[in-house]
Amino acid sequence: MIEPELSYVYIIAELDFDDDSKHTGFYKIGKAKNPFYRLAQLQTANARGLQLVHTIQCSKDKYDWDAPMDPNTRMNPIIEEYVGHREMQIQDLFDDYRCTPDRRLKQNHIEDVDDTRTYGGNEWYDFRKIGIDKVIDMIDDKFPPYLGILEKQLSLEFF
């Protein structure tokens, strides 16, 4: 039996320079097997402080672990596909709040908006207008943690 492989969709907050207990209103939605390790990776490339504010567990229950692992990646492809799909669903839910890199650069008073790699790809969101608490409530209501293959079968049969 393969040991459970936990994967998560996470939300990371960018912190204010002047008061690192306050969020700037910009958040990154991504996926990782270890959100705390991913936070540390992101922090090394970001001058502002970052804080993990929410995770959504997307792993399967202990009875669904018989799927073979990919020998090259040593990952369970069923889980990776699911986690990637869940991340995409959550990101699409908030597409109207997605930040273009130059919007974040301007907000942070960086003049060279052509250097779009400074703040990474399109996984950053501007939630200043709706607030992170509402975002988390919407995610938790719409995307409960994955319960395994049985949940997928039931949703296909009855919906």
Question: What role is predicted for each listed range?
Answer:
Residues M1-F159:
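Non-catalytic accessory segments flanking enzymatic or RNA/DNA-binding domains
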